[in-house]
Amino acid sequence: MSNWSIKDAYVGYNVNYWSSGLYGISEAGEVTVSPDPNHPEHTIGLNELAKDMVKSGVALPVLVRFPQILHHRVNSLCNAFNQAITRYDYQSDYLLVYPIKVNQQQTVVEEILASQVSKEVPQLGLEAGSKPELMAVLAMAQKASSVIICNGYKDVEYIRLALIGEKLGHQVYIVLEKLSELKVVLEEAKKLGVTPRLGLRVRLAFQGKGKWQASGGEKSKFGLSAAQVLNVINSLKDEDMLDSLQLLHFHLGSQIANIRDIRSGVSEAGRFYCELQKMGANVKCFDVGGGLAVDYDGTRSQSSNSMNYGLTEYANNIVSVLNDMCREHDQPMPRLISESGRYLTAHHAVLITDVIGTEAYKPEDLQAPDEEAPQQLKNMWDSWGEVSGRADQRALIEIYHDVQSDLAEVHSLFALGQMSLSDRAWAEQMNLRVCYELKGVMSGKYRFHRPVIDELNEKLADKFFVNFSLFQSLPDAWGIDQVFPVMPLSGLDKKPERRAVMLDITCDSDGTVDQYVDGQGIETTLPVPAWSAESPYLIGFFLVGAYQEILGDMHNLFGDTNSAVVRLDDDGLVNIESVLAGDTVADVLRYVNLDAVSFMRTYEELVNLHIQEDERANILEELQIGLKGYTYLEDFS
């Protein structure tokens, strides 16, 4: 009888550490979500939720959003800073600014803004990094504090739109990223009769560690050097507009894993702030940018997929460093701003889809090679016998290496025409048989076994063909080796019988999830319950709410997935709302300037030319349905 428990499942998939308490596993072995931490007793089973959506006509894959998680993340971050401000007697306040580049979906932005609708003084603003984003936030920022921060490269039109935002009642901070922007801002402000609110992005010497570390340091794409900062100060003094400089901004990069890097960046930027104040500037806001990390792998480490600090520690470090510096230099304490988009959005979205097929190794009975067989085959047969005879633990490693060497020789001889196809097939099957036997007798308790066990897991892993596009739904997994938690949505009440790798349905060998979160850290395979064609086998990809949608591409013309907003009411009842259909085939063809209407005319011509009259209507109907259909697989039975 198995001693497997739900606790083992939590450990095996490291759920307690990457989920922030928002996702869990029920006693029935199904993955759950608790979208409203104020009511942790109210949970949603993701497996049943997906089945209900399919019954209602929502085809998989589907991206499911939980807006209550967005509300929780906003308020948690604001509360962390508010408590730190109280703890250190910091003499100013905190503003959370959401950079919409992280996820520009209307539902996401509106839910973030709605999270503080009941607050007398909302602590929310919006950030734009381009003209399209600015046009969006100009129409939405009034739902919160009306604070807008404008980053990125700016032309005259961008700058004029930002200044017009002031006329619309917003507080718009135009952050100077390049020295040349200052002249344009001042000229256009005079034309419009607007007093601009200026910000400076300073280029720090300090550079944090991580995948986005190029955002900081002396060679960073954006920001002003110390000399350029002085140039701006002198230019503003000459124009008698030094009071317009109201914000200091820096950015170490997204996903800063080490809290020491954050402290170092705040400390250096704090010195800039104090020096600017001494020069007569009136900087009122200190914007630390992004960097607040998400613990994707749950290791609480300095890994680029993790973080070695918590939310309280993050806020305490920023507040305490700037508090001490301002007191030391007798300077007023500025309003603190952070642009923490990844932290706000990552957890709120889950991609749910189905496994449409598998390829698994099953041991086959093999006959012993005859006397005339190549020596390599005889060696492999003998090695298998040694495993079956339970060789000592260190000898198992040698057996594995010997078999791999023999197999490599078989492949070489086959390529040279010195070995038959049947011999090669036998050798490959025997290799898998030996690996299968070795995996059964080797143990992770022996340190010297572990590297080989990892190799065996990879060699023997089942292939799960999953109905999604890695390039569309998890582009960072492909592009920068970002890790996302992956879990089967059911069957977790039993010990996993297999290990598997997830393959998407694109015609690209890169469409493979290469890294998986488990209790041992990051692995190349995922423990899974056995697959059965008798019932749907659903997979969840978690923490996909930040960047993935907008970065996703249309490789093989797989388009946007279906999406749905799911909310719990006060009684714990599930409401599926705002279901948005994903791209149809016609939609993605139009995106690459292919005209579905003209295609239909061509189909009609070809049908009339090649198809018998009694079949034409049915064929044309199928072609039309194909153009209107979902880009993902809908019927694979």
Swiss-Prot record:
Q: In which pathway does it act?
A: Amine and polyamine biosynthesis; agmatine biosynthesis; agmatine from L-arginine: step 1/1
Gene3D superfamilies reported for this sequence: 1.10.287.3440, 1.20.58.930, Alanine racemase, Lyase, Ornithine Decarboxylase, Chain A, domain 1
User: Which keywords label this protein?
Assistant: Decarboxylase, Lyase, Magnesium, Metal-binding, Polyamine biosynthesis, Pyridoxal phosphate, Spermidine biosynthesis
**Pfam families attached to this UniProt entry:** Arg_decarb_HB, Arg_decarbox_C, Orn_Arg_deC_N
Under the heading InterPro entries, the entry gives: Ala_racemase/Decarboxylase_C (IPR009006), Arg_decarb_HB (IPR040634), Arg_decarbox_C (IPR041128), Arg_decrbxlase (IPR002985), De-COase2_N (IPR022644), Orn/DAP/Arg_de-COase (IPR000183), PLP-binding_barrel (IPR029066)
GO BP annotations, alphabetical order:
arginine catabolic process; putrescine biosynthetic process from arginine; spermidine biosynthetic process
Task: State the source organism's domain of life.
Answer: Bacteria
N6-(pyridoxal phosphate)lysine found at: K101
HAMAP family according to UniProt: SpeA (MF_01417)
* Family of the protein in this entry: Belongs to the Orn/Lys/Arg decarboxylase class-II family. SpeA subfamily.
The name on file for this protein is Biosynthetic arginine decarboxylase
Organism in which the protein naturally occurs: Shewanella loihica (strain ATCC BAA-1088 / PV-4)
